[in-house]
């Protein structure tokens, strides 16, 4: 691909700009430009599309996206050391690369780009799951993005595509199953990165479901958080803080079942019962927010 876009090999770019990957930023750089092209192709045709990329680093995936014809790339980069390398790419593709320096968790993505938008990113390991959840949970749906093609830890990828009765099924699987069609595209071994991470990565592709089961985001979050927060307990116990057996009875769900056996439709039914009717509460402590790993 170096011959395709006329820019130097990524290893040379990294050495010239002194871009040693920082663990604190969750950085692992991809050096294989053929692999970055494969990731970009997984997103589908990119002509007339604006692509949002998070954590471009030295720009390997950025170059692949632009070479495959994306109308524009809007890249969010937190590390100022990477900006000169990205500026070289911008000069090679005039008017087609906008770089936003900042923390992706604080960016208003809906205001970043116009027209058809796809998200393609090698997500930093330390913020990848939270970014995905943020993109899944806007009240307004369908979302601003047409698809997401993300490279993440394989463990997270398995959680994204998991369904009921799968060992990897949890809160993330419910949210993704509720609002998207998700598939694992291919795995990426640690040796493809510098420095090599300790885990295998995977590329996952998600497309929004235009008309998901009607359900309030806030209620579904409460139900899944309570259920999977004590995933080995029966639902009558794990849901005690939000109504327990009374809530389960209204939803027509056996209180002796466990969280991992419920389908997405059943979780939505519980959420709608929680929102639509007053259910006795036990006075338990407020629910936490976020997606800690033990809740999956």
Swiss-Prot record:
It is found in: Cytoplasm. It comes from Sinorhizobium fredii (strain NBRC 101917 / NGR234). Its main location: cytoplasm. Its EC number is 2.1.1.182. The keyword Membrane does not apply. GO terms for cellular component: cytosol. Keywords: Cytoplasm, Methyltransferase, RNA-binding, rRNA processing, S-adenosyl-L-methionine, Transferase. It catalyses: adenosine(1518)/adenosine(1519) in 16S rRNA + 4 S-adenosyl-L-methionine = N(6)-dimethyladenosine(1518)/N(6)-dimethyladenosine(1519) in 16S rRNA + 4 S-adenosyl-L-homocysteine + 4 H(+). CDD domains: AdoMet_MTases. S-adenosyl-L-methionine binds at residues 28, 30, 55, 77, 103, 122. InterPro entries: KsgA/Erm, rRNA_Ade_diMease-like_C, rRNA_Ade_Mease_Trfase_CS, rRNA_Ade_methylase_Trfase_N, rRNA_adenine_dimethylase, SAM-dependent_MTases_sf. SMART domains: rADc. It is an enzyme of class 2 (transferase). This is Ribosomal RNA small subunit methyltransferase A. GO terms for molecular function: 16S rRNA (adenine(1518)-N(6)/adenine(1519)-N(6))-dimethyltransferase activity; RNA binding.
């Amino acid at each position: 691909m170096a011959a395709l876009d006329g820019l130097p090999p990524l290893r040379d770019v990294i050495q010239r700009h002194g871009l040693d990957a920082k663990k604190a930023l969750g950085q692992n750089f991809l050096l294989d430009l053929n692999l970055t092209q494969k990731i970009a192709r997984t997103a589908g045709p990119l002509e007339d599309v604006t692509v949002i990329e998070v954590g471009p680093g030295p720009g390997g995936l950025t170059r692949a996206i632009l070479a495959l014809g994306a109308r524009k790339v809007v890249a969010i980069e937190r590390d100022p050391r990477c900006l000169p390398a990205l500026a070289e790419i911008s000069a090679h593709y005039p008017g087609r690369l906008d770089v936003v320096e900042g923390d992706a968790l604080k960016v208003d993505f809906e205001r970043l780009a116009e027209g058809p938008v796809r998200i393609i990113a090698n997500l930093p390991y330390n913020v990848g799951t939270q970014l995905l959840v943020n993109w899944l949970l806007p009240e307004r749906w369908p979302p601003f993005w047409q698809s997401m093609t993300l490279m993440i830890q394989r463990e997270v990828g398995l959680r994204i595509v998991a369904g009921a009765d799968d060992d990897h099924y949890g809160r993330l699987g419910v949210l993704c199953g509720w609002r998207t069609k998700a598939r694992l595209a291919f795995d990426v071994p640690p040796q493809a990165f510098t420095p090599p991470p300790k885990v295998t990565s995977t590329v996952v592709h998600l497309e929004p479901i235009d008309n998901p089961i009607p359900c309030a985001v806030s209620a579904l979050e409460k139900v899944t958080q309570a259920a999977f927060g004590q995933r080995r307990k029966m639902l009558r116990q794990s849901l005690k803080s939000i109504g327990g057996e009374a809530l389960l009875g209204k939803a027509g769900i056996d209180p002796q079942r466990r969280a991992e056996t419920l389908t997405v439709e059943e979780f939505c039914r519980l959420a709608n019962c929680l929102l639509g009717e007053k259910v006795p509460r036990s006075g338990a402590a407020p629910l936490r927010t976020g997606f800690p790993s033990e809740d999956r």
